[in-house]
């Protein structure tokens, strides 16, 4: 079931059948951002998640040597090697649904797995994009904010479980597993290697010159 933003839903109540006597209980739950009932557009191409003109080496990606992207949540993620404080921009427009920018520590320590600064943007079709390992206090957007493709989200860093300054970028989709639990699985990513609107303008200018 999808819970709308800024909403809550009571899932159940726990009470003792023997008044005055002690009791114990445990709970188990799972959740994921997005909508598992909707299918993302598999033909969509994303812009690179950093400012135009910036050059980056791919440190890790699907199809190459994999060192840490072994789970379904990161199988198709791409690690872009970037100097700290490099501008990070939205690869696709959407709504910011998650922001963390208060973590300061980073390094190749598994204890830091959940201590990376992150921005998550939700899109139509139920998918999200994740921008991870951002700089401390390096996020310039807030939850609920609508962003456009290419808009500044923050600055790259080296927070959390990280072997060096880079941007971990992933497109994810909420998926319901056979056991009923919900997970955030990564999806294959296609990038376009040019600015479509800019390319069209250049193409039109070239046609005018030829005439």
Go through each PLM region and give its residues:
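Structural recognition of the beta-strand scaffold that forms the well-ordered cores
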Residues: 57-59, 79, 88-90, 98, ...
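Short histidine-centered loop motifs in beta-beta connectors
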Residues: 83, 89, 125-150
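Acidic, glycine-rich catalytic/binding loops that coordinate metals and/or anionic ligands
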Residues: 46, 57, 109, 139-148, ...
């Amino acid at each position: 079931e999808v819970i709308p933003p800024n909403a809550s839903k009571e899932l159940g109540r726990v009470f003792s059948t023997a008044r005055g006597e002690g009791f114990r209980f445990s709970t188990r739950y799972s959740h994921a951002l997005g909508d598992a009932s909707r299918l993302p557009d598999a033909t969509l191409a994303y812009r690179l998640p950093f400012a135009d003109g910036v050059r980056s080496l791919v440190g890790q990606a699907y199809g190459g040597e994999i060192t840490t992207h072994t789970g379904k949540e990161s199988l198709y993620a791409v690690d872009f090697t970037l100097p700290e404080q490099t501008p990070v921009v939205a690869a696709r427009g959407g709504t910011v649904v998650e922001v963390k920018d208060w973590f300061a520590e980073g390094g190749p320590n598994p204890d830091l797995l959940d201590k990376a600064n992150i921005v998550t943007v939700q899109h139509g079709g139920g998918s999200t994009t994740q921008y991870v390992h951002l700089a401390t206090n390096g996020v310039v957007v807030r939850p609920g904010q609508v962003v456009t493709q290419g808009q500044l989200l923050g600055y790259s860093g080296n927070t959390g479980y990280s072997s060096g300054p880079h941007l971990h970028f992933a497109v994810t989709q909420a998926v319901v597993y056979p056991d009923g639990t919900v997970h955030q699985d990564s999806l294959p990513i296609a990038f376009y290697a040019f600015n479509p609107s800019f390319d069209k303008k250049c193409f039109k200018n070239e046609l005018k010159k030829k005439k």
